[in-house]
């Protein structure tokens, strides 16, 4: 009997590889626990005559998995299951979970299937499961957001980090459920910063799912992730890493892999596409602006102030959309600072301001001190000294600061025109009592902008290093994300990259509650530094706590998995 030809064998092998699909990006912090297999379209019903939105209707930078219309069992139109809008990938694991919730009657068998403890104990997840069941029966156009696990670390406590949802899909929420697919393990009590108190899980041999209620789901994709603390019910003993992995990430014997958790979010009802006569009346997404500009301020009656505002925004960038924080001033604290009244018409006071490039804080009187909303006039006439020698010096300072600003590379093209207009508007008419105030405002603004752009010029290489994750941040000492590439380590097979984190920021006095574990030694050093004492090594931001990492490596022609301590920075502090 003649065997298959070589070309047929090659085609068969290529077909097998194509059926296997392209492997998805692995979870960097779970090398021994790969993600679930690629999901086919089994159980996802796509009707042939549905008019889906074109690819351009989805916002750029959105998730790889668009909004899908699915059903759970049955075909559309036969009344067996309503249409469900799902944002994200609905794998076979989540599909089985939704099927189980839909058909549950919440008897003892169903409680055991979801790992719920006896009804005598308070179950935070049970009302949410029943609410999800009601949504599956009558979706009312609401979308179900499915977030998959991106990263996990096991020590000192499990930290689960999930995908970040689209803007507007995570706040506010009607429901947030953490769904786990368990393996063998004991009954446990689970606590965590994102959970509404302690919750009990009672898995049995018949348990296919575990569900935890989440009241602050944003912790699942911000920072280091959702922290879970599991202890045995009764004696409160902690579980080992192997026990945690076996319980939380059950094994899928058919695919030789582990089943990773998912976070299900149910935002409130909103306007969504609705089917009608085999068509979809789609509501396209608004095209996002790449560089959102702030709302233009109300036109000012003073062209000088309007031009100065435009110059500052052009050189410093648009302000944030959040409202500016109010400056709470403590009168007792202000009493300790050098202060005094400054007469802006006094040449000596203006000369002191000219000699200093420090920022200027102007405290305006409260609205009650101004009669009928009319600004109080400046006191004191404009002297001849201001009109002669001091005015020339102010003009010289203006021209010097403006010339230096024009010479900085990367200056916006509108800055030169705004500078020329400001110099023409200031100090104004000789008889204008606001001339000295305008001169001070313009001078301090130009000095501040010049100082900032000088710093940008000097720290250009440092910013390039900071983009690579090697420079120190200007904020307070805190934990920053840092990805480490292990591909240069030839002995390490998995993971290729992982989130190691790093500590960056400044150490100053007083220490804040960001780093509550500071010691007396660093407090004394920071106080000495604040008094101007020279220190050979000033306090710096360093990791103060670490977690281990599971690595799969190749050594002497053997593949081994071992736990390496102190691989992930979990806390930072000044030392």
Swiss-Prot record:
Preproprotein is proteolytically processed to generate N- and C-terminal cleavage products that homodimerize and associate to form a biologically active non-covalent complex. Binding of the non-covalent complex to AMHR2 induces dissociation of the pro-region from the mature C-terminal dimer. The N-terminal portion of the protein, despite having no intrinsic activity, has the role of amplifying the activity of the C-terminus. Residues 21-466 form a propeptide. One of its GO terms (biological process) is anti-Mullerian hormone receptor signaling pathway. Disulfide bonds join 477-541, 503-572, 507-574. Glycans are attached at residues 78, 343. InterPro entries: AMH_N, Cystine-knot_cytokine, Muellerian-inhibiting_factor, TGF-b_C, TGFb_CS. GO terms for cellular component: extracellular space. The record marks 466-467 as: Cleavage. Residues 1-20 form the signal peptide. It is found in: Secreted. It comes from the Eukaryota. Keywords: Differentiation, Disulfide bond, Glycoprotein, Gonadal differentiation, Growth factor, Secreted, Signal. GO terms for molecular function: growth factor activity; type II transforming growth factor beta receptor binding. Detected in fetal Sertoli cells. Expressed in granulosa cells of growing follicles but also in theca cells of preovulatory follicles and corpora lutea (at protein level). It holds the Pfam family TGF_beta. Plays an important role in several reproductive functions. Induces Muellerian duct regression during male fetal sexual differentiation and plays a role in Leydig cell differentiation and function. In female acts as a negative regulator of the primordial to primary follicle transition and decreases FSH sensitivity of growing follicles. AMH signals by binding to a specific type-II receptor, AMHR2, that heterodimerizes with type-I receptors (ACVR1 and BMPR1A), and recruiting SMAD proteins that are translocated to the nucleus to regulate target gene expression. Belongs to the TGF-beta family. Homodimer; disulfide-linked. PANTHER family: MUELLERIAN-INHIBITING FACTOR. This is Muellerian-inhibiting factor. It comes from Sus scrofa (Pig). The gene is AMH.
């Amino acid at each position: 009997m003649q065997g298959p030809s070589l070309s047929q064998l090659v085609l068969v092998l290529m077909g097998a590889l194509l059926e296997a699909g392209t492997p998805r990006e692995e979870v960097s912090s779970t090398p021994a626990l790969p993600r679930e297999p690629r999901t086919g379209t089994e159980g996802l019903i796509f009707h042939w005559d549905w008019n889906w939105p074109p690819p351009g209707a989805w916002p750029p930078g959105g998730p790889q998995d668009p909004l899908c219309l699915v059903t759970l069992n049955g075909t559309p139109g036969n009344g067996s299951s309503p249409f469900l809008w799902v944002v994200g990938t609905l794998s076979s694991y989540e599909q089985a979970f939704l099927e189980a919730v839909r058909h549950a009657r919440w008897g003892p068998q169903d409680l055991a299937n979801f790992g719920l403890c006896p009804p005598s104990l308070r179950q935070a997840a049970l009302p949410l499961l029943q609410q999800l069941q009601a949504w599956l029966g009558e979706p009312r156009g609401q979308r179900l957001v499915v977030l998959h696990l991106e990263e996990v670390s096991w020590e000192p406590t499990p930290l689960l980090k999930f995908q970040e949802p689209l803007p507007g899909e995570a706040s506010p929420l009607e429901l947030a459920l953490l769904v786990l697919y368990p393996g063998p393990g004991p009954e446990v009590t689970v606590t965590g910063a994102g959970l509404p108190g302690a919750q009990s899980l009672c898995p049995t041999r018949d348990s296919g799912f575990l569900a935890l209620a989440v009241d602050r789901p944003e912790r699942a994709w911000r920072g280091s992730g959702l922290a879970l603390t599991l202890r045995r019910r009764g004696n409160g003993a902690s579980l080992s890493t192997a026990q945690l992995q076996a319980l939380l990430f059950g094994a899928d014997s058919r695919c030789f892999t582990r089943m990773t958790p998912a976070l299900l979010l149910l935002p409130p009802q909103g306007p969504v596409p609705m089917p009608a006569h085999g068509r979809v009346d789609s509501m396209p997404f608004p095209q996002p602006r790449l560089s959102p500009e702030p709302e233009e301020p109300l036109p000012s009656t003073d062209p000088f102030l309007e031009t100065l505002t435009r110059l500052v925004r052009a050189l410093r960038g648009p302000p944030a959309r959040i409202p500016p924080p109010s400056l709470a001033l403590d009168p007792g604290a202000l009493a300790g600072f050098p202060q005094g009244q400054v007469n802006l018409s006094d040449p000596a006071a203006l000369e002191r301001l000219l000699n200093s490039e420090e920022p200027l804080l102007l405290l305006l009187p409260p609205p009650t001190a101004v009669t009928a909303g009319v600004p109080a006039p400046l006191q004191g006439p404009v002297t001849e000294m201001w009109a002669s020698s001091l005015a020339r010096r102010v003009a010289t300072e203006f021209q010097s600061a403006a010339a230096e600003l024009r010479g900085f590379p990367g200056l916006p093209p509108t800055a030169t025109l705004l500078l020329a207009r400001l110099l023409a508007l200031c100090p104004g008419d000789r008889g204008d009592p606001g001339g000295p105030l305008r001169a001070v405002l313009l001078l301090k603004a130009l000095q501040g902008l010049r100082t900032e752009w000088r710093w940008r010029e000097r720290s250009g290489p440092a910013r390039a290093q900071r983009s690579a994750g090697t420079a120190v941040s200007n904020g307070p000492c805190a934990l920053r994300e840092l990805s480490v590439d292990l591909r240069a380590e030839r002995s390490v097979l998995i993971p290729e990259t992982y989130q190691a984190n790093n500590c960056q920021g400044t150490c100053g006095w007083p220490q804040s509650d960001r780093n509550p574990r500071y010691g007396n030694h660093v407090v004394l050093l920071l106080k000495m530094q604040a008094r101007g004492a020279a220190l050979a090594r000033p306090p710096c931001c360093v990791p103060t706590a670490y977690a281990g990492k599971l690595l799969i490596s190749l050594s002497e022609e053997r593949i081994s998995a071992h736990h390496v301590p102190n691989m992930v920075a979990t806390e930072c502090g000044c030392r």
